[in-house]
Amino acid sequence: MMTAPLPDIAAPAAPPRRLPFSFAKRQGLLFLCLEEQYWLACRPQVELAAIAEAQRFAGRRLPLKALGEDAFNQALAASYQHDSSAAMQLAEDLGGSLDLAALADQVPETEDLMEQEDDAPIIRLINAILGEAIRENASDIHLETFEKRLVVRFRVDGVLREVLEPKRELAALLVSRIKVMARLDIAEKRIPQDGRISLRVGGREVDIRVSTLPSANGERVVLRLLDKQAGRLNLQHLGMSERDRKLMDETVRKPHGILLVTGPTGSGKTTTLYASLTTLNDRTRNILTVEDPIEYHLEGIGQTQVNAKVDMTFARGLRAILRQDPDVVMVGEIRDRETAEIAVQASLTGHLVLSTLHTNSAIGAITRLVDMGIEPFLLSSSMLGVLAQRLVRVLCPACKEPYRADEAECALLGVDPAAPPTLHRARGCGECHQHGYRGRTGIYELVVFDDHMRSLIHNESSEQEMTRHARTSGPSIRDDGRRKVLEGVTTVEEVLRVTREE
Protein backbone atom coordinates (compact mmCIF):
# COMPACT_ATOMS: atom_id res chain seq x y z
CA MET A 1 0.00 0.00 0.00
CA MET A 2 1.08 3.57 -0.71
CA THR A 3 1.54 5.75 2.35
CA ALA A 4 0.27 9.30 2.64
CA PRO A 5 1.28 12.16 4.92
CA LEU A 6 -0.74 12.64 8.07
CA PRO A 7 -3.83 14.65 7.14
CA ASP A 8 -5.42 17.34 9.25
CA ILE A 9 -8.11 15.65 11.32
CA ALA A 10 -11.24 17.72 11.68
CA ALA A 11 -13.72 16.80 14.32
CA PRO A 12 -17.00 16.07 12.56
CA ALA A 13 -20.13 17.88 13.61
CA ALA A 14 -21.81 14.56 14.35
CA PRO A 15 -19.06 12.02 15.01
CA PRO A 16 -19.74 8.47 13.83
CA ARG A 17 -19.71 5.47 16.13
CA ARG A 18 -16.01 4.84 16.60
CA LEU A 19 -14.20 1.54 16.43
CA PRO A 20 -13.36 0.19 19.89
CA PHE A 21 -9.95 1.50 20.82
CA SER A 22 -8.40 -1.93 21.37
CA PHE A 23 -9.57 -3.08 17.90
CA ALA A 24 -8.32 0.12 16.26
CA LYS A 25 -4.88 -0.16 17.82
CA ARG A 26 -4.49 -3.92 17.42
CA GLN A 27 -5.73 -4.14 13.82
CA GLY A 28 -4.37 -0.81 12.58
CA LEU A 29 -7.68 0.65 11.43
CA LEU A 30 -9.36 3.94 12.21
CA PHE A 31 -12.38 5.93 11.02
CA LEU A 32 -11.41 9.47 9.96
CA CYS A 33 -13.51 12.40 8.82
CA LEU A 34 -11.68 14.52 6.23
CA GLU A 35 -13.46 17.41 4.54
CA GLU A 36 -16.87 16.04 5.53
CA GLN A 37 -15.99 12.64 4.02
CA TYR A 38 -15.53 9.53 6.15
CA TRP A 39 -12.53 7.28 5.44
CA LEU A 40 -11.20 4.03 6.81
CA ALA A 41 -7.57 4.83 7.60
CA CYS A 42 -5.19 1.89 7.79
CA ARG A 43 -1.55 1.35 8.59
CA PRO A 44 0.76 -0.85 6.46
CA GLN A 45 0.11 -4.61 6.17
CA VAL A 46 -3.39 -4.52 7.61
CA GLU A 47 -5.35 -7.76 7.22
CA LEU A 48 -8.21 -7.93 4.72
CA ALA A 49 -10.42 -9.69 7.29
CA ALA A 50 -9.95 -6.77 9.68
CA ILE A 51 -10.89 -4.30 6.94
CA ALA A 52 -14.04 -6.29 6.21
CA GLU A 53 -14.94 -6.34 9.92
CA ALA A 54 -14.43 -2.57 10.19
CA GLN A 55 -16.62 -1.98 7.12
CA ARG A 56 -19.29 -4.20 8.66
CA PHE A 57 -19.03 -2.25 11.91
CA ALA A 58 -19.45 1.03 10.00
CA GLY A 59 -22.54 -0.31 8.27
CA ARG A 60 -21.33 0.85 4.84
CA ARG A 61 -18.29 0.69 2.57
CA LEU A 62 -15.83 3.48 3.31
CA PRO A 63 -12.94 4.44 1.02
CA LEU A 64 -9.51 3.40 2.32
CA LYS A 65 -6.82 5.90 3.33
CA ALA A 66 -3.36 4.38 3.76
CA LEU A 67 -1.10 5.90 6.44
CA GLY A 68 2.44 5.17 7.51
CA GLU A 69 3.10 3.63 10.92
CA ASP A 70 3.96 6.92 12.64
CA ALA A 71 1.21 8.84 10.90
CA PHE A 72 -1.34 6.22 11.86
CA ASN A 73 -0.29 6.30 15.52
CA GLN A 74 -0.56 10.10 15.58
CA ALA A 75 -4.01 9.93 13.99
CA LEU A 76 -5.06 7.29 16.49
CA ALA A 77 -3.94 9.43 19.43
CA ALA A 78 -5.60 12.53 17.97
CA SER A 79 -8.87 10.70 17.35
CA TYR A 80 -9.07 9.29 20.88
CA GLN A 81 -7.30 12.13 22.70
CA HIS A 82 -10.35 13.27 24.68
CA ASP A 83 -10.35 9.77 26.22
CA SER A 84 -6.90 10.63 27.60
CA SER A 85 -3.72 8.81 26.73
CA ALA A 86 -3.82 7.25 30.20
CA ALA A 87 -7.00 5.41 29.26
CA MET A 88 -5.37 4.07 26.11
CA GLN A 89 -2.44 2.81 28.13
CA LEU A 90 -4.93 1.29 30.53
CA ALA A 91 -6.53 -0.75 27.76
CA GLU A 92 -3.13 -2.15 26.78
CA ASP A 93 -1.57 -2.77 30.19
CA LEU A 94 -3.93 -5.35 31.66
CA GLY A 95 -1.44 -6.50 34.25
CA GLY A 96 -0.84 -3.14 35.90
CA SER A 97 -2.21 -2.29 39.35
CA LEU A 98 -3.74 1.18 39.43
CA ASP A 99 -5.37 3.41 42.00
CA LEU A 100 -9.14 2.90 41.96
CA ALA A 101 -10.01 6.59 41.72
CA ALA A 102 -7.41 7.17 39.01
CA LEU A 103 -8.75 4.16 37.15
CA ALA A 104 -12.29 5.57 37.20
CA ASP A 105 -11.07 8.93 35.88
CA GLN A 106 -9.31 7.23 32.98
CA VAL A 107 -12.35 5.41 31.62
CA PRO A 108 -13.51 6.96 28.32
CA GLU A 109 -17.08 8.21 28.14
CA THR A 110 -18.08 6.13 25.13
CA GLU A 111 -20.56 3.35 24.57
CA ASP A 112 -18.21 1.81 22.00
CA LEU A 113 -16.35 0.21 24.87
CA MET A 114 -19.21 -2.23 25.25
CA GLU A 115 -18.15 -3.78 21.95
CA GLN A 116 -14.97 -5.02 23.61
CA GLU A 117 -14.97 -8.31 25.44
CA ASP A 118 -11.61 -8.55 27.09
CA ASP A 119 -9.65 -5.36 27.66
CA ALA A 120 -12.00 -2.39 27.80
CA PRO A 121 -11.22 0.21 30.44
CA ILE A 122 -14.78 -0.17 31.74
CA ILE A 123 -14.07 -3.84 32.43
CA ARG A 124 -10.80 -2.92 34.07
CA LEU A 125 -12.70 -0.51 36.32
CA ILE A 126 -15.25 -3.16 37.31
CA ASN A 127 -12.49 -5.69 37.96
CA ALA A 128 -10.65 -3.13 40.07
CA ILE A 129 -13.81 -2.35 42.09
CA LEU A 130 -14.40 -6.06 42.68
CA GLY A 131 -10.76 -6.65 43.56
CA GLU A 132 -10.68 -3.77 46.03
CA ALA A 133 -13.94 -4.92 47.63
CA ILE A 134 -12.55 -8.42 48.09
CA ARG A 135 -9.27 -7.08 49.52
CA GLU A 136 -11.23 -5.01 52.04
CA ASN A 137 -13.52 -7.96 52.84
CA ALA A 138 -16.59 -5.98 51.80
CA SER A 139 -19.87 -7.86 52.01
CA ASP A 140 -21.70 -5.65 49.51
CA ILE A 141 -20.94 -3.24 46.66
CA HIS A 142 -23.51 -0.53 45.89
CA LEU A 143 -23.61 1.28 42.53
CA GLU A 144 -26.00 4.17 43.04
CA THR A 145 -27.05 6.55 40.28
CA PHE A 146 -28.27 10.00 41.23
CA GLU A 147 -29.28 12.97 39.09
CA LYS A 148 -25.80 14.45 38.82
CA ARG A 149 -23.47 11.81 40.20
CA LEU A 150 -22.63 8.13 40.34
CA VAL A 151 -21.48 6.66 43.66
CA VAL A 152 -19.79 3.36 44.49
CA ARG A 153 -20.08 2.30 48.14
CA PHE A 154 -18.75 -0.72 50.03
CA ARG A 155 -20.29 -2.29 53.10
CA VAL A 156 -17.29 -3.32 55.18
CA ASP A 157 -17.81 -4.94 58.58
CA GLY A 158 -21.49 -3.97 58.47
CA VAL A 159 -20.89 -0.25 57.83
CA LEU A 160 -21.57 1.38 54.45
CA ARG A 161 -19.05 3.92 53.18
CA GLU A 162 -18.38 5.73 49.93
CA VAL A 163 -15.23 4.65 48.10
CA LEU A 164 -15.53 6.14 44.63
CA GLU A 165 -17.43 8.70 42.58
CA PRO A 166 -16.88 7.88 38.90
CA LYS A 167 -18.11 10.12 36.10
CA ARG A 168 -21.91 10.16 35.95
CA GLU A 169 -21.77 9.23 32.26
CA LEU A 170 -20.30 5.81 33.15
CA ALA A 171 -23.45 4.65 34.96
CA ALA A 172 -25.06 2.93 31.98
CA LEU A 173 -21.76 1.31 30.96
CA LEU A 174 -21.08 -0.07 34.43
CA VAL A 175 -24.60 -1.43 34.84
CA SER A 176 -24.63 -2.98 31.36
CA ARG A 177 -21.29 -4.70 31.85
CA ILE A 178 -22.34 -6.09 35.25
CA LYS A 179 -25.56 -7.35 33.66
CA VAL A 180 -23.55 -9.13 30.98
CA MET A 181 -21.33 -10.75 33.61
CA ALA A 182 -24.41 -11.87 35.58
CA ARG A 183 -26.22 -13.09 32.43
CA LEU A 184 -29.06 -10.62 32.85
CA ASP A 185 -31.09 -8.92 30.12
CA ILE A 186 -29.20 -5.70 29.37
CA ALA A 187 -32.14 -4.29 27.38
CA GLU A 188 -34.61 -4.66 30.27
CA LYS A 189 -34.39 -1.62 32.51
CA ARG A 190 -37.98 -1.41 33.77
CA ILE A 191 -38.05 -4.30 36.24
CA PRO A 192 -35.69 -5.62 38.95
CA GLN A 193 -33.38 -8.48 37.96
CA ASP A 194 -31.30 -10.95 39.94
CA GLY A 195 -28.25 -12.87 38.81
CA ARG A 196 -24.99 -14.40 39.91
CA ILE A 197 -21.29 -14.07 39.04
CA SER A 198 -18.56 -16.55 40.03
CA LEU A 199 -14.95 -15.34 40.24
CA ARG A 200 -11.58 -16.56 41.40
CA VAL A 201 -9.49 -13.79 42.95
CA GLY A 202 -6.08 -14.47 44.44
CA GLY A 203 -6.82 -18.19 44.65
CA ARG A 204 -10.12 -17.54 46.46
CA GLU A 205 -13.44 -18.50 44.93
CA VAL A 206 -16.01 -15.75 45.32
CA ASP A 207 -19.68 -15.86 44.37
CA ILE A 208 -21.44 -12.56 43.75
CA ARG A 209 -25.21 -12.15 43.92
CA VAL A 210 -26.32 -9.31 41.66
CA SER A 211 -29.52 -7.34 42.17
CA THR A 212 -30.66 -4.50 39.90
CA LEU A 213 -33.45 -2.05 40.70
CA PRO A 214 -34.94 0.64 38.42
CA SER A 215 -34.90 4.11 39.95
CA ALA A 216 -35.75 7.65 38.89
CA ASN A 217 -32.17 8.34 37.77
CA GLY A 218 -31.24 4.97 36.28
CA GLU A 219 -30.70 1.48 37.58
CA ARG A 220 -29.16 0.83 40.99
CA VAL A 221 -27.04 -2.29 41.43
CA VAL A 222 -26.09 -4.11 44.61
CA LEU A 223 -23.55 -6.93 44.52
CA ARG A 224 -23.43 -9.27 47.53
CA LEU A 225 -20.01 -10.91 47.83
CA LEU A 226 -20.05 -14.46 49.16
CA ASP A 227 -16.62 -15.83 50.02
CA LYS A 228 -16.87 -19.59 49.52
CA GLN A 229 -14.26 -20.11 52.24
CA ALA A 230 -16.78 -18.77 54.76
CA GLY A 231 -18.85 -21.87 54.13
CA ARG A 232 -16.02 -24.01 55.52
CA LEU A 233 -16.17 -22.55 59.02
CA ASN A 234 -17.03 -24.67 62.02
CA LEU A 235 -18.26 -23.70 65.48
CA GLN A 236 -14.74 -23.01 66.75
CA HIS A 237 -14.36 -20.11 64.29
CA LEU A 238 -17.39 -18.08 65.35
CA GLY A 239 -15.99 -16.29 68.42
CA MET A 240 -18.24 -18.03 70.94
CA SER A 241 -17.30 -18.29 74.58
CA GLU A 242 -16.13 -21.71 75.69
CA ARG A 243 -19.44 -22.25 77.49
CA ASP A 244 -21.55 -21.36 74.44
CA ARG A 245 -19.40 -23.37 72.03
CA LYS A 246 -19.62 -26.53 74.12
CA LEU A 247 -23.37 -26.16 74.64
CA MET A 248 -23.90 -25.43 70.94
CA ASP A 249 -21.83 -28.46 69.95
CA GLU A 250 -23.83 -30.68 72.31
CA THR A 251 -27.13 -29.26 71.07
CA VAL A 252 -26.50 -29.75 67.34
CA ARG A 253 -25.49 -33.35 67.99
CA LYS A 254 -28.90 -34.19 69.48
CA PRO A 255 -30.76 -36.74 67.31
CA HIS A 256 -33.94 -34.71 66.97
CA GLY A 257 -35.51 -31.37 67.87
CA ILE A 258 -35.39 -27.77 66.63
CA LEU A 259 -32.53 -25.32 67.07
CA LEU A 260 -33.24 -21.76 65.97
CA VAL A 261 -30.79 -18.93 65.27
CA THR A 262 -32.26 -15.43 65.56
CA GLY A 263 -31.15 -11.93 64.74
CA PRO A 264 -31.69 -9.13 62.21
CA THR A 265 -30.65 -9.34 58.56
CA GLY A 266 -26.87 -9.45 58.19
CA SER A 267 -26.16 -10.73 61.70
CA GLY A 268 -24.40 -13.91 60.56
CA LYS A 269 -27.25 -16.39 61.09
CA THR A 270 -26.58 -18.33 57.88
CA THR A 271 -22.86 -18.58 58.67
CA THR A 272 -23.72 -20.06 62.08
CA LEU A 273 -26.05 -22.61 60.48
CA TYR A 274 -23.38 -23.59 57.95
CA ALA A 275 -20.81 -23.94 60.73
CA SER A 276 -23.24 -26.23 62.57
CA LEU A 277 -23.77 -28.34 59.44
CA THR A 278 -20.02 -28.55 58.86
CA THR A 279 -19.62 -29.85 62.42
CA LEU A 280 -22.17 -32.59 61.69
CA ASN A 281 -20.96 -33.41 58.18
CA ASP A 282 -19.03 -36.63 58.88
CA ARG A 283 -20.54 -38.83 56.13
CA THR A 284 -22.65 -40.78 58.63
CA ARG A 285 -25.64 -38.42 58.32
CA ASN A 286 -27.92 -37.45 55.46
CA ILE A 287 -27.96 -33.65 55.67
CA LEU A 288 -30.38 -31.73 53.45
CA THR A 289 -31.15 -28.02 53.19
CA VAL A 290 -33.72 -25.74 51.59
CA GLU A 291 -32.40 -22.20 51.18
CA ASP A 292 -33.19 -18.85 49.57
CA PRO A 293 -30.69 -18.59 48.00
CA ILE A 294 -27.90 -21.15 48.43
CA GLU A 295 -25.12 -18.88 49.71
CA TYR A 296 -22.30 -21.43 50.01
CA HIS A 297 -22.03 -24.84 48.42
CA LEU A 298 -21.13 -27.45 51.04
CA GLU A 299 -19.48 -30.68 49.96
CA GLY A 300 -21.42 -33.76 51.03
CA ILE A 301 -24.64 -31.87 51.83
CA GLY A 302 -27.76 -31.85 49.63
CA GLN A 303 -28.84 -28.26 49.04
CA THR A 304 -32.13 -27.14 47.46
CA GLN A 305 -33.00 -23.58 46.47
CA VAL A 306 -36.37 -21.88 46.84
CA ASN A 307 -37.86 -20.75 43.51
CA ALA A 308 -40.99 -18.62 43.76
CA LYS A 309 -41.51 -18.69 39.97
CA VAL A 310 -42.39 -22.39 40.07
CA ASP A 311 -43.98 -22.30 43.54
CA MET A 312 -40.97 -23.98 45.14
CA THR A 313 -41.46 -22.51 48.62
CA PHE A 314 -39.76 -23.31 51.91
CA ALA A 315 -42.78 -25.37 52.94
CA ARG A 316 -42.89 -27.33 49.68
CA GLY A 317 -39.13 -27.91 49.72
CA LEU A 318 -39.23 -29.02 53.34
CA ARG A 319 -42.01 -31.52 52.62
CA ALA A 320 -39.98 -32.97 49.75
CA ILE A 321 -36.82 -33.16 51.86
CA LEU A 322 -38.60 -35.15 54.54
CA ARG A 323 -39.29 -37.87 51.95
CA GLN A 324 -35.53 -38.15 51.29
CA ASP A 325 -34.69 -39.98 54.54
CA PRO A 326 -32.81 -37.06 56.17
CA ASP A 327 -31.06 -37.07 59.52
CA VAL A 328 -30.51 -33.31 59.64
CA VAL A 329 -32.64 -30.66 57.92
CA MET A 330 -31.70 -27.01 57.55
CA VAL A 331 -34.43 -24.54 56.55
CA GLY A 332 -33.05 -21.15 55.56
CA GLU A 333 -35.83 -19.26 57.31
CA ILE A 334 -39.19 -19.95 58.95
CA ARG A 335 -41.38 -17.29 57.36
CA ASP A 336 -44.91 -18.61 57.74
CA ARG A 337 -47.15 -20.92 59.71
CA GLU A 338 -47.00 -23.74 57.15
CA THR A 339 -43.20 -23.95 57.25
CA ALA A 340 -43.21 -23.72 61.05
CA GLU A 341 -45.76 -26.54 61.37
CA ILE A 342 -43.79 -28.85 59.06
CA ALA A 343 -40.54 -28.07 60.92
CA VAL A 344 -42.13 -28.88 64.28
CA GLN A 345 -43.63 -32.13 62.99
CA ALA A 346 -40.29 -33.11 61.45
CA SER A 347 -38.52 -32.56 64.77
CA LEU A 348 -41.11 -34.66 66.58
CA THR A 349 -40.68 -37.54 64.13
CA GLY A 350 -36.96 -37.99 64.66
CA HIS A 351 -35.22 -35.26 62.65
CA LEU A 352 -32.84 -32.53 63.75
CA VAL A 353 -34.10 -29.24 62.29
CA LEU A 354 -31.96 -26.08 62.11
CA SER A 355 -33.46 -22.78 61.00
CA THR A 356 -33.54 -19.00 61.49
CA LEU A 357 -36.10 -16.44 62.61
CA HIS A 358 -36.04 -12.65 62.40
CA THR A 359 -36.48 -11.79 66.06
CA ASN A 360 -34.40 -9.51 68.26
CA SER A 361 -34.02 -11.89 71.20
CA ALA A 362 -33.74 -15.61 71.86
CA ILE A 363 -36.98 -15.89 73.84
CA GLY A 364 -38.70 -13.70 71.25
CA ALA A 365 -38.48 -16.70 68.89
CA ILE A 366 -40.94 -18.63 71.06
CA THR A 367 -43.39 -15.72 71.07
CA ARG A 368 -43.08 -15.40 67.28
CA LEU A 369 -43.83 -19.09 66.70
CA VAL A 370 -46.85 -18.95 69.03
CA ASP A 371 -48.06 -15.86 67.15
CA MET A 372 -47.72 -17.85 63.91
CA GLY A 373 -50.17 -20.37 65.32
CA ILE A 374 -47.91 -23.13 66.66
CA GLU A 375 -49.34 -24.73 69.80
CA PRO A 376 -47.19 -24.13 72.92
CA PHE A 377 -47.34 -27.81 73.90
CA LEU A 378 -45.76 -28.73 70.54
CA LEU A 379 -43.00 -26.15 71.03
CA SER A 380 -42.27 -27.37 74.54
CA SER A 381 -41.77 -30.88 73.16
CA SER A 382 -39.76 -29.99 70.07
CA MET A 383 -37.50 -27.03 70.90
CA LEU A 384 -33.88 -27.73 71.84
CA GLY A 385 -32.76 -24.12 72.13
CA VAL A 386 -32.40 -20.70 70.55
CA LEU A 387 -29.22 -18.80 69.70
CA ALA A 388 -29.57 -15.02 69.39
CA GLN A 389 -26.63 -13.25 67.77
CA ARG A 390 -25.23 -9.98 66.44
CA LEU A 391 -22.02 -9.06 64.67
CA VAL A 392 -19.60 -6.48 66.08
CA ARG A 393 -16.50 -5.08 64.43
CA VAL A 394 -13.16 -6.33 65.74
CA LEU A 395 -10.54 -3.76 66.70
CA CYS A 396 -7.47 -3.76 64.49
CA PRO A 397 -4.75 -5.49 66.56
CA ALA A 398 -2.05 -3.40 64.89
CA CYS A 399 -3.34 -0.01 66.02
CA LYS A 400 -5.95 -0.38 68.77
CA GLU A 401 -5.27 2.14 71.52
CA PRO A 402 -5.56 1.34 75.25
CA TYR A 403 -7.21 3.76 77.68
CA ARG A 404 -8.86 3.77 81.11
CA ALA A 405 -12.65 3.35 81.17
CA ASP A 406 -14.60 6.38 82.38
CA GLU A 407 -17.50 6.28 84.86
CA ALA A 408 -20.21 5.86 82.23
CA GLU A 409 -18.35 2.97 80.62
CA CYS A 410 -17.79 1.33 83.99
CA ALA A 411 -21.53 1.55 84.65
CA LEU A 412 -22.31 -0.04 81.28
CA LEU A 413 -19.78 -2.79 81.89
CA GLY A 414 -20.93 -3.40 85.46
CA VAL A 415 -17.50 -2.83 87.01
CA ASP A 416 -16.34 -0.73 89.96
CA PRO A 417 -15.37 2.80 88.77
CA ALA A 418 -12.83 2.91 91.60
CA ALA A 419 -10.82 0.33 89.68
CA PRO A 420 -11.55 1.15 86.04
CA PRO A 421 -10.47 -1.53 83.54
CA THR A 422 -8.26 -0.90 80.53
CA LEU A 423 -10.33 -0.76 77.36
CA HIS A 424 -9.31 -0.18 73.76
CA ARG A 425 -10.47 2.29 71.12
CA ALA A 426 -10.21 2.33 67.33
CA ARG A 427 -7.41 4.41 65.90
CA GLY A 428 -6.67 3.54 62.25
CA CYS A 429 -3.56 2.49 60.35
CA GLY A 430 -2.49 1.12 56.98
CA GLU A 431 -3.31 -2.43 58.03
CA CYS A 432 -7.00 -1.60 58.48
CA HIS A 433 -7.28 1.09 55.75
CA GLN A 434 -7.49 3.76 58.49
CA HIS A 435 -10.79 2.35 59.79
CA GLY A 436 -9.57 1.09 63.16
CA TYR A 437 -11.37 -2.23 62.71
CA ARG A 438 -10.56 -5.44 60.85
CA GLY A 439 -13.23 -8.09 60.48
CA ARG A 440 -16.21 -8.97 62.64
CA THR A 441 -17.05 -11.47 65.32
CA GLY A 442 -20.29 -12.61 66.90
CA ILE A 443 -21.79 -11.87 70.28
CA TYR A 444 -24.26 -14.49 71.41
CA GLU A 445 -27.03 -15.47 73.77
CA LEU A 446 -27.57 -19.24 73.78
CA VAL A 447 -30.67 -20.48 75.60
CA VAL A 448 -30.77 -24.27 75.88
CA PHE A 449 -34.21 -25.39 77.01
CA ASP A 450 -34.34 -27.29 80.29
CA ASP A 451 -37.39 -28.85 81.93
CA HIS A 452 -38.35 -25.62 83.68
CA MET A 453 -38.23 -23.64 80.42
CA ARG A 454 -40.35 -26.32 78.73
CA SER A 455 -42.95 -26.04 81.48
CA LEU A 456 -42.98 -22.25 81.11
CA ILE A 457 -43.62 -22.63 77.36
CA HIS A 458 -46.25 -25.32 77.92
CA ASN A 459 -48.07 -23.15 80.46
CA GLU A 460 -47.97 -20.16 78.08
CA SER A 461 -45.96 -18.04 80.50
CA SER A 462 -45.08 -14.48 79.50
CA GLU A 463 -41.95 -13.62 77.54
CA GLN A 464 -40.67 -11.72 80.58
CA GLU A 465 -40.93 -14.82 82.79
CA MET A 466 -39.09 -16.96 80.25
CA THR A 467 -36.41 -14.28 79.86
CA ARG A 468 -35.87 -14.13 83.63
CA HIS A 469 -35.34 -17.88 83.73
CA ALA A 470 -32.98 -17.75 80.74
CA ARG A 471 -30.83 -15.19 82.59
CA THR A 472 -30.32 -17.65 85.47
CA SER A 473 -28.71 -20.19 83.16
CA GLY A 474 -26.53 -18.04 80.93
CA PRO A 475 -25.43 -14.53 79.92
CA SER A 476 -27.47 -12.19 77.72
CA ILE A 477 -26.24 -11.03 74.35
CA ARG A 478 -25.13 -7.72 75.87
CA ASP A 479 -23.28 -9.59 78.63
CA ASP A 480 -21.35 -11.45 75.93
CA GLY A 481 -20.60 -8.10 74.30
CA ARG A 482 -19.30 -6.73 77.60
CA ARG A 483 -16.98 -9.72 77.87
CA LYS A 484 -15.53 -8.98 74.44
CA VAL A 485 -15.07 -5.30 75.33
CA LEU A 486 -13.13 -6.21 78.48
CA GLU A 487 -11.02 -8.65 76.46
CA GLY A 488 -10.06 -5.86 74.05
CA VAL A 489 -11.80 -7.50 71.09
CA THR A 490 -14.23 -4.65 70.36
CA THR A 491 -15.48 -1.34 71.75
CA VAL A 492 -18.35 -0.24 73.97
CA GLU A 493 -19.76 1.76 71.04
CA GLU A 494 -19.91 -1.34 68.85
CA VAL A 495 -21.77 -3.38 71.46
CA LEU A 496 -24.25 -0.56 72.07
CA ARG A 497 -24.75 -0.12 68.31
CA VAL A 498 -25.98 -3.69 67.82
CA THR A 499 -27.81 -4.22 71.14
CA ARG A 500 -29.83 -1.03 71.52
CA GLU A 501 -33.07 -2.97 71.96
CA GLU A 502 -31.66 -4.93 74.92
Curated annotation (Swiss-Prot):
Family annotation (SUPFAM superfamilies): EspE N-terminal domain-like, P-loop containing nucleoside triphosphate hydrolases
Phenotype when the gene is knocked out: Mutants show complete loss of extracellular exotoxin A secretion.
Keywords from the UniProt entry: ATP-binding, Cell inner membrane, Cell membrane, Membrane, Metal-binding, Nucleotide-binding, Protein transport, Translocase, Transport, Zinc
Catalysis: reaction(s): ATP + H2O + cellular proteinSide 1 = ADP + phosphate + cellular proteinSide 2
Keyword hit for ATP-binding: yes
Start and end residues of each stretch annotated as Disordered: 461-480
Binding site for Zn(2+): C396, C399, C429, C432
GO MF: ATP binding; ATP hydrolysis activity; metal ion binding; protein-exporting ATPase activity
Induction: By the two quorum-sensing circuits LasR-LasI and RhlR-RhlI in a growth-phase dependent manner.
Quaternary data: Homodimer. Dimerization is directed by a relatively short domain near the extreme N-terminus and is essential for extracellular protein secretion. May form homooligomers. Interacts with XcpY/GspL. Forms an inner membrane platform subcomplex with XcpS/GspF, XcpY/GspL and XcpZ/GspM.
Name of the protein this chain belongs to: Type II secretion system protein E
Biological source species: Pseudomonas aeruginosa (strain ATCC 15692 / DSM 22644 / CIP 104116 / JCM 14847 / LMG 12228 / 1C / PRS 101 / PAO1)
High-level lineage: Bacteria, Pseudomonadati, Pseudomonadota, Gammaproteobacteria, Pseudomonadales
